[in-house]
A protein has these predicted regions:
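The substrate-binding groove and active-site-proximal loops of carbohydrate-active enzymes
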Residues: 1-12, 84
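Active-site-proximal substrate-binding groove within the catalytic cores of carbohydrate-active enzymes
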Residues: 14-168
Length: 168
């Protein structure tokens, strides 16, 4: 005897039951899913999607964010944890940060241990992100050249746009 006719029905019942019980305990609970098992149908169970692990790889982080944004509707898309070597140039730090502008950046560095140039660069781009967050996260997203890790990305909202061009 089967409880469900298909694996999909069983998984849906399990996930629905788990998320319903968690939301009864904490109505505003954050439930995160990682990129490797995210798709449009999983949106009803979670409220946060994160790019799969790609340490120190700005291009994969950017591609992961854009891929998730295209399939995730209004669900929040978070970058993989950003990290870099403290010996890196400020330009390298900026590249990591500009590559995650269209998602929610997650910084995995000890802020108080950063070189001053890195701290200023981080502050600059996080200030930019905060100022333009609505456009970046809620705007109509377009991107070119997935084979080049989306080297041109644009988000438009209410007559304003943020456009980035990356030289991979």
């Amino acid at each position: 005897r089967r409880d469900f006719e298909s694996l999909e029905e069983g998984i849906d019942a399990l996930m629905t039951d788990v998320t319903d019980k968690l939301r009864k305990i904490k109505p505003d609970i954050m439930i995160e899913f990682r990129q490797s098992y995210v798709g449009p149908s999983i949106r009803k169970y979670g409220n946060m999607f994160r790019v799969t692990d790609c340490p120190c790889d700005a291009q994969l982080n950017r591609r992961g964010i854009i891929d998730l944004r295209f399939t995730s509707g209004k669900t929040a898309v978070h970058s993989d944890m950003l990290m870099w070597n403290v010996a890196d140039t400020k330009e390298s730090v900026a590249y990591q940060l500009t590559s995650v502008l269209y998602g929610v950046p997650q910084i995995s560095m000890l802020i108080d241990k950063l070189p001053k140039e890195h701290y200023r660069t981080l502050k600059h781009y996080l200030d930019f992100w905060r100022e333009h967050r609505e456009i970046l996260l809620d705007g109509k997203l377009t991107a070119q050249s997935p084979e080049s890790f989306y080297n041109q990305v644009c988000s438009c909202l209410d007559g304003e746009a943020v456009i980035t061009v990356y030289n991979n």
